[in-house]
């Protein structure tokens, strides 16, 4: 599946690569490849309140909590559209620096302004989704979050500094696509195996 090249420890040349790709990965600020989304649900375009589950991604609050914890008036919430991302600064078991998830299940939804939302302006969306699912970006957040500074379970991560975080990514979109396709296929296989296990129980 891949060949092996030396790593300099800076994520510039991952040790595991698909054949045919040997260019060093490039450091980019989040702001280089994504724009912040701050549009409000001012006209109540959606009445679907969203929340982020570290395991399941962006989901309907009602389905997730069996109730809505959002305000009845969601006109002040962010309006997030399908394919856009949101960062939940709340920590949970196994996710010490929160979660970044893409909206996949619905065409749009309303999200609390406690979240930091963004839309890609370049790069393969499935690859970026896989990258943020990998938690490789955690050390970037660690560097900008005040140690021990939490407010009601939320990390103290300023939005402007969040968009200044640097990420090593492949410039070649073909490599991005190959990585994304591999991870998608692997996830589907894991889901299928889990389904078999659940049916046996």
Q: Residues of each region from the PLM?
A:
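A short beta-sheet element
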Residues: 74-137, 150, 158
């Amino acid at each position: 599946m891949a060949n092996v090249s030396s790593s300099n420890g800076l994520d510039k040349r991952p040790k595991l690569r698909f054949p045919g790709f040997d260019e060093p990965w490039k450091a980019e600020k989040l702001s280089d490849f994504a724009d912040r989304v701050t549009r409000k649900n001012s006209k109540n375009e959606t009445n679907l309140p969203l929340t982020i589950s570290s395991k399941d991604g962006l989901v309907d609050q009602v389905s997730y909590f069996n109730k809505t914890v959002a305000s009845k008036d969601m006109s002040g919430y962010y309006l997030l559209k399908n394919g856009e991302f949101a960062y939940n600064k709340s920590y949970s078991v196994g996710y010490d620096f929160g979660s970044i998830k893409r909206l996949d299940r619905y065409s749009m939804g309303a999200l609390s302004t406690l979240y930091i939302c963004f839309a890609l302006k370049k790069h393969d969306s499935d690859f970026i989704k896989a990258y943020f699912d990998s938690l490789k970006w955690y050390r970037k957040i660690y560097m900008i979050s005040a140690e021990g500074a939490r407010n009601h379970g939320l990390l103290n991560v300023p939005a402007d500094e969040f968009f200044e975080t640097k990420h090593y990514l492949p410039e070649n979109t073909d490599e991005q696509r190959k990585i994304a396709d591999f991870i998608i296929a692997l996830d589907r296989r894991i889901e299928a195996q889990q389904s078999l296990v659940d049916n046996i129980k």
